[in-house]
């Protein structure tokens, strides 16, 4: 059994719904899962005690990538989380009208790799909440479960 932390930043509830569904699916796979809103998170050694960390963040932006405010504060301190040697995956909810649709996914993956993490699943990019594409959420969870 692995210990998995799911940290999310959500303004409208869409990313939170994805995080909650992932929590349910990964726990059903026999793993211990902690769900944490980025608004309640402190970066300092956040990943300690966890085998894997899943990060979820809504994002948008026409010219520049804009991340959800609570998550952005955490993202700016990623170097303090303790990601070296950890398994990481990213997911996001967004609006395809924006140039940076779900742009948080590649930003999170790139930064996590720079800090020594291993990306264990292709990032999940969704329009709206988990109910819009439950198969995509389930497939992402299965990919994560295979690497735990």
UniProtKB/Swiss-Prot annotation:
Top-rank taxon: Bacteria
Q: Note the InterPro entries from the entry.
A: Flav_short, Flavodoxin, Flavodoxin/NO_synth, Flavodoxin_CS, Flavoprotein-like_sf
Show the stretches that span the lipid bilayer: none
Q: Which GO terms describe its molecular function?
A: electron transfer activity; FMN binding
* SUPFAM superfamilies noted in UniProt: Flavoproteins
**Where's the Flavodoxin-like domain?**
4-145
Which cysteine residues pair off into disulfide bonds? none
Q: Which cofactor does it need?
A: FMN
Matching Gene3D superfamilies, A to Z?
3.40.50.360
Keywords noted in UniProt: Electron transport, Flavoprotein, FMN, Transport
What family, per the record? Answer: Belongs to the flavodoxin family.
Q: What does this protein do?
A: Low-potential electron donor to a number of redox enzymes.
- The identity of this protein, by name, is Flavodoxin
